From Swiss-Prot:
This is Golgi phosphoprotein 3-like. It comes from Rattus norvegicus (Rat). Homooligomer. Does not interact MYO18; differs from GOLPH3 by its inability to interact with MYO18. May interact with ARF1. It comes from the Eukaryota. GO terms for cellular component: cytosol; Golgi apparatus; Golgi cisterna; Golgi cisterna membrane; Golgi membrane; trans-Golgi network. Belongs to the GOLPH3/VPS74 family. Gene3D superfamilies: yeast vps74-n-term truncation variant domain like.
Length: 285
């Protein structure tokens, strides 16, 4: 589980960076939950996994921080939320014995292909698995964090590289080779900085200018991305360009959001249960 921390920086640098981001035209307006299609929508340019990885990548170097050990599980959580939002999976209904989000199993709703290799591979695993598993177990299985050798087949391999290749195909990243003394490493520097800055601006606005203080009134994908970015330990990258005052406000509001009780929020009207189930799984880990 990641933690939200305060930091001290030179205000001049943060103001300069903030001004640069705000100067970019926000061409893709946030969609309201009422207009959001839970199925495959051509309006959704990036998947949640692609957005999380893009936020975690160093722009020029083209790789995530070597010290970030949270992003792998964060990406797997993003896969589950993305599948739920596309109407492919859902949590079994609550019963007297299984009320908690983490006690309820992930069930298949539709096995129709999504067009995304990682999503379809995960969908295939969920369809073939008997007995069914919980959200927390699926995150562990997809990450490969299991002691059961018979469950290792469910591990998704080379996830970051495969997501990066998708972003290359979409014109947001490029592919390079870098030499690190004893070995060569494939990296993916950001080429479309406008798209990344648009994404960062959207998250910044969601906890600043457009803050609604009620997750049920937030855009579903923005809420999911905030939860995943926090769990993947990449939110510092998003907020580091803000002035100190705005940084503190953004971090405190995000902290309040991720510290809400998932069991309570998941039962509210129009709540996306999978978002809160994934958050509950990360809070427990």
């Amino acid at each position: 589980m990641t933690t939200l921390t305060h930091r001290t920086r030179r205000t001049e640098v943060s103001k300069s960076c903030e001004k640069k981001i705000e100067s970019e035209e926000d061409t893709n307006q946030e969609r309201s939950p009422d207009n959001e299609d839970p199925g495959d929508s051509k309006d959704i340019r990036l998947t949640l996994m692609e957005e999380v990885l893009l936020l975690g990548l160093k722009d020029k170097e083209g790789y995530t921080s070597f010290w970030n050990d949270c992003i792998s599980s964060g990406l797997r959580g993003g896969i589950l939320i993305e599948l739920a939002m596309r109407g492919r999976i859902y949590l079994e209904p609550p019963t007297m014995r299984k009320k908690r989000l983490l006690d309820r199993k992930v069930l298949l709703k539709s096995d129709s292909p999504t067009g995304d290799v990682l999503l379809d591979e995960t969908l295939k695993h969920i369809k073939a698995t008997e007995p069914t598993e919980t959200v927390q177990t699926w995150i562990e299985l997809l990450t490969g964090e299991t002691w059961n050798p018979f469950k290792l087949q469910y591990q998704l391999r080379n996830v970051r590289e495969r997501i990066a290749k998708n972003l290359v195909e979409k014109g947001i990243l490029t592919t390079e080779k870098q030499n690190f003394l004893l070995f060569d490493m494939t990296t993916h520097p950001v080429t479309n900085t406008t798209e990344k800055q648009r994404l960062m601006k959207k998250l910044q606005d969601s906890v600043l200018e457009r803050w609604v203080n009620d997750p049920q009134r937030m855009d579903r994908r923005t809420l999911a991305l905030l939860v995943l970015a926090h769990s993947s330990d990449v939110l510092e990258n998003v907020f580091s360009c803000l002035t100190d005052d705005k940084y503190d406000v953004a971090m405190n509001r995000t902290k309040d959001l991720v510290e809400l009780d998932p069991e309570v929020e998941g039962t509210k009207h129009n709540a996306t249960e999978m978002i809160w189930a994934v958050l509950a799984a990360f809070n427990k880990s």
